[in-house]
Amino acid sequence: MDRIIQSPGKYIQGADVINRLGEYLKPLAERWLVVGDKFVLGFAQSTVEKSFKDAGLVVEIAPFGGECSQNEIDRLRGIAETAQCGAILGIGGGKTLDTAKALAHFMGVPVAIAPTIASTDAPCSALSVIYTDEGEFDRYLLLPNNPNMVIVDTKIVAGAPARLLAAGIGDALATWFEARACSRSGATTMAGGKCTQAALALAELCYNTLLEEGEKAMLAAEQHVVTPALERVIEANTYLSGVGFESGGLAAAHAVHNGLTAIPDAHHYYHGEKVAFGTLTQLVLENAPVEEIETVAALSHAVGLPITLAQLDIKEDVPAKMRIVAEAACAEGETIHNMPGGATPDQVYAALLVADQYGQRFLQEWE
């Protein structure tokens, strides 16, 4: 099996970089469709338009309808084709960005992505998650290429609720442990091959960055200011984790997240908040040293991520619910089968309950 790493063509990050969008995007195309969150366009549209105009580019702005569905993609395609746009810029949150990526793919044109939050590692990936108009999961759209450009304005990210940054840390915290597991098992990653040394190194750097800078970055996020620590964590959440998960591989942590979606209790928690508990579960499954489990739990707790089931509002009928979660996490095609030696529902059930016990014990010690 060949080793493969893939990543966006260019990654650009800085405070007020939105003012320089036009000059960065100019080499890709002259006429652009900008698909933006209505909320983001509310404060950024004039800046975006000025940036394009100053660079001599033609821009058409289309507010995102709210759901990354095939109908929404087709609607936006009509606007883009009428305006003869030769490239797409997505600006906003995850569904907006996934829509922009899918739209550009169907049109066969370049795409640039400008995330305004750092809550997941999705912006850099060659993947869009497609939903129905009602918001039900429809399918994964695997794209042939990563975005041509990912541009992150750290000042805009700093303006978002701090909990979103914490969720991004939760998502990124899994990257090293899942890549490490895939490296040990020789699993095939989403890039279509085995992981490279480079992908593993980025995944490990991601983890070390979160350990060193995570708590400091959260203090900045709570004050909505940009500091060197916040800059580093935004890069870890977005780029290091993005390349790390796609080319390093996913394992138990994300499968446990998917299992948790099979029960209603934790539905209102963010992706990364559920992944954080999934990471603790994976470490128990691997029989990791207790020091490693405690280090991960301590970082999670410090930035406000859940380390017990109760913190995910799973408080009643816990054993029965964990059976459901464990079965769903071990479904055919789930990433848990990338673990060395695989995993059975019984093993995952045990790991879920023990991870919860660890979390409860740490909370008693720390509080």
UniProtKB/Swiss-Prot annotation:
<feature type="binding site">
    <location>
        <position position="271"/>
    </location>
    <ligand>
        <name>Zn(2+)</name>
    </ligand>
</feature>
<dbReference type="GO" id="GO:0042802">
    <property type="term" value="F:identical protein binding"/>
</dbReference>
<dbReference type="GO" id="GO:0051289">
    <property type="term" value="P:protein homotetramerization"/>
</dbReference>
<dbReference type="Pfam" id="PF00465">
    <property type="entry name" value="Fe-ADH"/>
</dbReference>
<feature type="binding site">
    <location>
        <position position="37"/>
    </location>
    <ligand>
        <name>NAD(+)</name>
    </ligand>
</feature>
<dbReference type="GO" id="GO:0005829">
    <property type="term" value="C:cytosol"/>
</dbReference>
<feature type="binding site">
    <location>
        <position position="254"/>
    </location>
    <ligand>
        <name>glycerol</name>
    </ligand>
</feature>
<dbReference type="GO" id="GO:0051596">
    <property type="term" value="P:methylglyoxal catabolic process"/>
</dbReference>
<keyword id="KW-0319">Glycerol metabolism</keyword>
<dbReference type="GO" id="GO:0032991">
    <property type="term" value="C:protein-containing complex"/>
</dbReference>
<comment type="function">
    <text>Catalyzes the NAD-dependent oxidation of glycerol to dihydroxyacetone (glycerone). Allows microorganisms to utilize glycerol as a source of carbon under anaerobic conditions. In E.coli, an important role of GldA is also likely to regulate the intracellular level of dihydroxyacetone by catalyzing the reverse reaction, i.e. the conversion of dihydroxyacetone into glycerol.</text>
</comment>
<keyword id="KW-0479">Metal-binding</keyword>
<comment type="subunit">
    <text>Homodimer and homooctamer. Forms homotetramers in a solution containing 5% glycerol.</text>
</comment>
<feature type="binding site">
    <location>
        <position position="116"/>
    </location>
    <ligand>
        <name>NAD(+)</name>
    </ligand>
</feature>
<dbReference type="InterPro" id="IPR018211">
    <property type="entry name" value="ADH_Fe_CS"/>
</dbReference>
<keyword id="KW-0862">Zinc</keyword>
<feature type="binding site">
    <location>
        <position position="95"/>
    </location>
    <ligand>
        <name>NAD(+)</name>
    </ligand>
</feature>
<protein>
    <recommendedName>
        <fullName>Glycerol dehydrogenase</fullName>
        <ecNumber>1.1.1.6</ecNumber>
        <ecNumber>1.1.1.75</ecNumber>
    </recommendedName>
</protein>
<feature type="binding site">
    <location>
        <position position="94"/>
    </location>
    <ligand>
        <name>NAD(+)</name>
    </ligand>
</feature>
<feature type="binding site">
    <location>
        <position position="121"/>
    </location>
    <ligand>
        <name>glycerol</name>
    </ligand>
</feature>
<feature type="binding site">
    <location>
        <position position="171"/>
    </location>
    <ligand>
        <name>Zn(2+)</name>
    </ligand>
</feature>
<feature type="binding site">
    <location>
        <position position="131"/>
    </location>
    <ligand>
        <name>NAD(+)</name>
    </ligand>
</feature>
<feature type="binding site">
    <location>
        <position position="125"/>
    </location>
    <ligand>
        <name>NAD(+)</name>
    </ligand>
</feature>
<dbReference type="GO" id="GO:0008270">
    <property type="term" value="F:zinc ion binding"/>
</dbReference>
<feature type="binding site">
    <location>
        <position position="254"/>
    </location>
    <ligand>
        <name>Zn(2+)</name>
    </ligand>
</feature>
<keyword id="KW-0520">NAD</keyword>
<dbReference type="GO" id="GO:0019588">
    <property type="term" value="P:anaerobic glycerol catabolic process"/>
</dbReference>
<dbReference type="InterPro" id="IPR001670">
    <property type="entry name" value="ADH_Fe/GldA"/>
</dbReference>
<feature type="binding site">
    <location>
        <position position="127"/>
    </location>
    <ligand>
        <name>NAD(+)</name>
    </ligand>
</feature>
<comment type="similarity">
    <text>Belongs to the iron-containing alcohol dehydrogenase family.</text>
</comment>
<keyword id="KW-0560">Oxidoreductase</keyword>
<dbReference type="GO" id="GO:0008888">
    <property type="term" value="F:glycerol dehydrogenase (NAD+) activity"/>
</dbReference>
<feature type="binding site">
    <location>
        <position position="119"/>
    </location>
    <ligand>
        <name>NAD(+)</name>
    </ligand>
</feature>
<dbReference type="GO" id="GO:0019147">
    <property type="term" value="F:(R)-aminopropanol dehydrogenase activity"/>
</dbReference>
<dbReference type="InterPro" id="IPR016205">
    <property type="entry name" value="Glycerol_DH"/>
</dbReference>
<comment type="pathway">
    <text>Polyol metabolism; glycerol fermentation; glycerone phosphate from glycerol (oxidative route): step 1/2.</text>
</comment>
